[in-house]
Amino acid sequence: MSEGFSSSSIQELYQSLKEITNNADVELFEDRITKLDFESTDEPKHANDIIKDRFLRPSNALPWSLLDMVQDVPHTSSPEDCSGKLDYKELLKVPDPINRTSYQFKRTGLEGKISGYKEEVDLKEVANANASNSLSITRSINHNQNSVRGSTAQLPFTPGGIPMKSVKTDSEQNGSSTMANATKLLHKDGQGLFDIPEGMNRGIKPMDSPAENEDQNGQFKELKQLNEIDNELDIRIEANEAKLKEEEKSAKSISEEIMEEATEETTADNADDAEIDELLPIGIDFGRTKPVSKSVPVKKEWAHVVDLNHKIENFDELIPNPARSWPFELDTFQKEAVYHLEQGDSVFVAAHTSAGKTVVAEYAIAMAHRNMTKTIYTSPIKALSNQKFRDFKETFDDVNIGLITGDVQINPDANCLIMTTEILRSMLYRGADLIRDVEFVIFDEVHYVNDQDRGVVWEEVIIMLPQHVKFILLSATVPNTYEFANWIGRTKQKNIYVISTPKRPVPLEINIWAKKELIPVINQNSEFLEANFRKHKEILNGESAKGAPSKTDNGRGGSTARGGRGGSNTRDGRGGRGNSTRGGANRGGSRGAGAIGSNKRKFFTQDGPSKKTWPEIVNYLRKRELLPMVVFVFSKKRCEEYADWLEGINFCNNKEKSQIHMFIEKSITRLKKEDRDLPQILKTRSLLERGIAVHHGGLLPIVKELIEILFSKGFIKVLFATETFAMGLNLPTRTVIFSSIRKHDGNGLRELTPGEFTQMAGRAGRRGLDSTGTVIVMAYNSPLSIATFKEVTMGVPTRLQSQFRLTYNMILNLLRIEALRVEEMIKYSFSENAKETLQPEHEKQIKVLQEELQTIEYKSCEICDNDIEKFLELMLAYKEATVNLMQEMVKSPSILHILKEGRLVAFRDPNDCLKLGFVFKVSLKDAVCVIMTFTKPYKLPNGEPNHLIYFPKADGYRRRNFPKFQKTDFYMEEVPVTAIEVITKRKFAAPLGKVIKKDVAALNEFNAETNNILDGKTLKEAINIEKQGLKIHQILLDRTNIRDEIFKLKSIKCPNLSQHIVPKFKAHVIKKKIEELYHLMSDQNLSLLPDYEKRLAVLKDTEFIDQNHNVLLKGRVACEINSGYELVLTELILDNFLGSFEPEEIVALLSVFVYEGKTREEEPPIVTPRLAKGKQRIEEIYKKMLCVFNTHQIPLTQDEAEFLDRKRFAMMNVVYEWARGLSFKEIMEMSPEAEGTVVRVITWLDEICREVKTASIIIGNSTLHMKMSRAQELIKRDIVFAASLYL
């Protein structure tokens, strides 16, 4: 720039600047920093260098004049001046705090001019961010041993979408959102700076310098002037130019030339800007300053329903390079899902079973492989995880598939990891480094969020997942997919695309089986055939009529009818007497749910099949090629029983028998020889070789898997299964049969829900093999109820409902990590979705009310102004006392004596207008009163209600403020008792009923009485203090005191008080509404907050946390216990209770926490005295914890409440002998449970042993650690821990 000037012009500029500086008459440079102190020189080159140094070359060092302003020079004194005294204050230095904020410039325009500054919280400045001090996704990676499972010593990653207190979230570090969320809870001053530190009531209060004290703030002025030095220089040059113009009018000064050149440059720049603006799009707004108004947040819809009523013709153009392709054309809903995944969105796919939801999951897995990221596939149960592992291994050749369960880790570094939701929850709380690489989380069978025990885990996982993770939710059809997706979207601040299809790939045809006849009732177009339904009733009623005529439309012996005589199992059709039931199945049904028994007056049983029923229907379906079939039976015992009834029926030829035999032999080679001959395996083998099988929770895991694999290969033609078979297992069949549409759910018999029926019926119909799926509902001896049948088969599926509840493990984990508060977890749960969705609407209402508050005008009055605020306060207190009085009066029997028919009362209508009327009737139950009103609403001349209290005895006050009520024709009005303001002693003697009937004499008396009242005579209250109970007496006393205080005020004598109080009262009402809205938006309105506070009190009392909610040693141990009963187990561990037992005794005692127990059978005696002593100690500790729970009124789950009554110690002997080395066959001889239950209990015990072992490390108990390791070794053997056939 300087090279554009000649040497002579530079010399002239130099001389001109010297003259400006040295001229005493022109005081342009007032501050010492910017004063131009030039040395005298005549050399042009030297002058050029000085100007360059001064203006063009920025210095790396600050001038001393500026440094003196921002630094303190320590006071130094000579030894002679010390006088032997030391200044100890010099030693009391407060160390500099860690500064987690930084100042950022606000820039505007394309040039990036600085327009202001802002202060932001920034964790990137924290040195050495790691898993123990940072929630950032960019923190340093921890040890490899914790990369998969994480550790309780680690913090989780920042949950996505949730504004964190004083924490900069990962999304903000990536620049995808503003700091408003992260710092909205910190207070800022007028300049936008944080002035009150978190946790303190007050902070820095800088002194604002008034205008008259500008000289005292010169240093701050100099800093400000330093930032504006360029502008000041321009101003001074302009001033100098004006002076030179006066002296040399004919010649131009150097300064003027400079200014002209600068103006020319500016004009050229503006011309360039205009050319650039022509090239830029009109709507461009980056880098431009825009006026920002503090608008009310608009309610944003995060869920977007995708329209499927179209075909995507250009799918190949939209997805030119798909991550995966299929040999068949995708359905529209699958294409939409794939498209949105490629766009980086999250999707919620709701479709029927076998509709092809798995395609979406497969595409996400392939996409993650292509992007070199990971996918996590979560399933509701471990068995489904194993099956999905096998399916995906067969589906993908190029993608690594891994499995993580409680006891197995296969290929944990794979691109796709399959696990249960509980495992993922644990990984999130423990900050597993593996989460960094996850791009997709697939939630399969989302409708299991309705599960009462495990639904809360799904919500926790969704809330805790980091921002970068995308969601793929797969579910059966549910009515509120949009609501659920909108909750996830709002919580995670992500758009969720809802793709819901009611279409079935294979339509269903629902039939009823009645007396060897298959009757279609609902066709494949979902049309109900009522004539056919009546036909099934006629068939069954016709058979029943041999014994007794039918009297009900629903048929005899149904769920709500008396049992009819006659059945299918006896020769004479009358049923047998003297058997276990009198009637029962043989007698045509039951009374209600059962029949009259021979020994007891009422014995309930179900209308069920005979031994011929299943052979008949199997042969019928076999002839019509409707096999294979699955029969859903809601009892393990009946599954086995019904399979036994098919003895003699064989579905397999010799070749199939040979293949089944070879597969079984190959599968059980992993078992010990003695385990291969277990009764259950031998029986299952004999059934399988005939093409028949059973599937329920009592089977050994290896037997269940063996049956599932053979069924998928088509070897099993008839399968009797419980409803767990329908839980996600991809095993379609030709026909599904319901042995009943009622089941026992643990509490009692009930009908199946439409969702349960749809889930099980959806197994019917194999895509590509069957044109329709056949569903059969069994009707044995009694016809089905049409209403029940329609509701179950065609009803609306169960809505997704939150099962969110607080657990101690969750509370302690959140208190441990401190970043996410428990209140926030509750706030963002699905249970609070409705309230949170209304928050933008509440904020909008608050803004409207605040604006309305600003428009209220207050009139000045010499009488009122001094104490009208006090009057309003006392008036509101008096009104509140009156409401409390009436609430208590309703509970008191005296109300009936006071509020008798004809009693004159003054009451308020919904608009707060006063009216007079006679009591006609009172309902104490509903706390309402019917009043015969005879006055118009009392209003002020301007139409506003008169809010003042109606004091009937104060004549002067009453005449000023309630001069005259206007009479009207009487009418009846129902008002709450609390709306009554005054109950007078006056009573209308004649019956009001006659007045209503327009009796002339009664009407005349009524008119005379009302005219007398309206003449303004003094009225007295009917409630006497002396005759009331203690509580009412106290309220009346308080109210009288308030009244006396009111009449001491000066404003009570104001003639216009009723008008002057209106704006004050209106402002009070608006403020109250605003407070209510703020309360609705606050954490104090959370429905689970009282429960949280009670549980906090429990944790404090039991010393899991301290008074400041810091997690203590007990709490850290409880964080490790995820299997339930964490408080009791922690007490056992820290009490060193387990340390005094041997490993085999420890696992036996711990079995009480995994075995659910039974209530009917008695517990077997404990085998050793030591175990008996351990049992007694566990009961003592549990009773102690129950006392604490009861003290704080903690709501308990059914399992927690019945822990001591369900005989949970019944498995103790079995586990003890297993740990001692007995074979599985031997322990089954003493087991009260089936083989599958025993295996499940021992498997869960291994998980508890692992958790206790980790807890022992925390407390430093090496002996317990060794014992728990030994205990795991003792139980992990043989058939219980045999490898899965899917792995």
From Swiss-Prot:
Compositionally biased region (Gly residues): 555-567, 585-595
Transmembrane stretches, start-end: none
Cellular component terms per the entry's GO annotation? cytoplasm; Ski complex
Motif DEVH box, which positions? 444-447
Q: Provide the positions where the record notes the PTM Phosphoserine.
A: S209
Any one GO BP annotation for this protein: defense response to virus
A Pfam family: DEAD
InterPro entries recorded for this chain?
DEAD/DEAH_box_helicase_dom (IPR011545), Helicase_ATP-bd (IPR014001), Helicase_C-like (IPR001650), MTR4-like_stalk (IPR048392), P-loop_NTPase (IPR027417), RNA-DNA_Helicase (IPR050699), SKI2-like (IPR016438), Ski2/MTR4_C (IPR012961)
Q: GO molecular function, one example? A: mRNA binding
Q: Which UniProt keywords apply?
A: Antiviral defense, ATP-binding, Cytoplasm, DNA-binding, Helicase, Hydrolase, Nucleotide-binding, Phosphoprotein, RNA-binding, Translation regulation
Give the Helicase C-terminal domain ranges. 638-815
Q: What is its EC number?
A: 3.6.4.13
What positions does the domain Helicase ATP-binding occupy?
A: 338-496
Q: Which domain of life is it from?
A: Eukaryota
**Role this protein plays:** RNA helicase component of the SKI complex involved in 3'-mRNA degradation pathway. Represses dsRNA virus propagation by specifically blocking translation of viral mRNAs, perhaps recognizing the absence of CAP or poly(A). Essential for cell growth only in the presence of M1 replicon.
- Subunit comment: Component of the SKI complex composed of at least SKI2, SKI3 and SKI8. The SKI complex interacts with SKI7, which makes the link between the SKI complex and the exosome in order to perform mRNA degradation.
Q: What is this protein called?
A: Antiviral helicase SKI2
The species is Saccharomyces cerevisiae (strain ATCC 204508 / S288c)
Organism classification: Eukaryota, Fungi, Dikarya, Ascomycota, Saccharomycotina
Q: Which gene encodes it?
A: SKI2
